[in-house]
């Protein structure tokens, strides 16, 4: 499939492609970017969903109100969200080496990208879930639903549209972060832009 795409793009762009960058390199960079986005978004969604749900249910008035958990998790999410990605990328190098075995490359970039996008998605998910009408939760409680059933069968389905919109926003943010990661050795489109764009600019 990959060879077919490279061959097809080469034929299409041959008349006007005037660059030392080959189509094969371009497709490889796209593949690396897709890999970083897909896995970081997958792990980030899982982590973000846990954070978002926890923030909603443990806040004051939540169905599992717990001030201790909320007042620890809330500032932690804010702190991680406000941390510039390039600083986070460097700060988690020891953790990346433990988990992946190296701090350079596409797989290594997935660790800081996941840590970066998780709290961001967590806050967006929290916002979406808080938009659900209180009456729906009260109705679920009146029917005898437990907290897990309330979240999974009532709140999340009701917030589905908002969750999809916020997931799109998170994905766009993540793509921007992958370009930044590529500039420091992660590969992908960011690496391509630095190697064949900025460094060769005359």
Describe each region flagged by the PLM.
Residues 129-159, 199:
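Short helix-to-coil transition segments within interhelical loops
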Residues 147-179:
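Transmembrane alpha-helices
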Residues 18, 22-26, 60-71, 147-151, ...:
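Juxtamembrane loop-helix boundary motifs flanking transmembrane segments in multi-pass membrane proteins
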Residues 26, 30, 34, 76-79, ...:
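Hydrophobic alpha-helical elements at and bordering transmembrane segments
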Residues 1-28:
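Short, strongly hydrophobic alpha-helical membrane anchors
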Residues 95, 166-202:
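Non-cytoplasmic
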Residues 27-130, 165-174:
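Membrane-water interface segments at the C-terminal ends of transmembrane alpha-helices
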């Amino acid at each position: 499939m990959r060879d077919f795409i490279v061959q097809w793009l080469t034929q299409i762009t041959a008349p006007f492609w005037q660059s030392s960058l080959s189509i094969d390199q371009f497709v490889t960079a796209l593949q690396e970017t897709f890999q970083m986005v897909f896995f970081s978004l997958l792990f980030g969604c899982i982590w973000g969903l846990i954070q978002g749900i926890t923030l909603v249910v443990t806040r004051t008035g939540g169905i599992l109100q717990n001030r201790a958990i909320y007042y620890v998790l809330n500032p932690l999410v804010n702190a991680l969200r406000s941390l510039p990605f390039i600083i986070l990328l460097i700060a988690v190098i020891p953790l990346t080496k433990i988990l992946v075995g190296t701090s350079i490359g596409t797989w290594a970039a997935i660790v800081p990208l996941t840590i970066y996008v998780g709290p961001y998605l967590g806050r967006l998910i929290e916002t979406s879930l808080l938009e659900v009408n209180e009456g729906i939760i009260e109705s679920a409680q009146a029917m005898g639903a437990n907290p897990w059933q309330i979240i999974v069968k009532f709140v999340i389905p009701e917030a589905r549209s908002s969750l999809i919109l916020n997931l799109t926003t998170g994905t766009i943010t993540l793509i921007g972060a992958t370009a930044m990661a590529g500039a420091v050795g992660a590969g992908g489109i960011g690496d391509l832009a630095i190697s064949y764009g900025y460094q060769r600019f005359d």
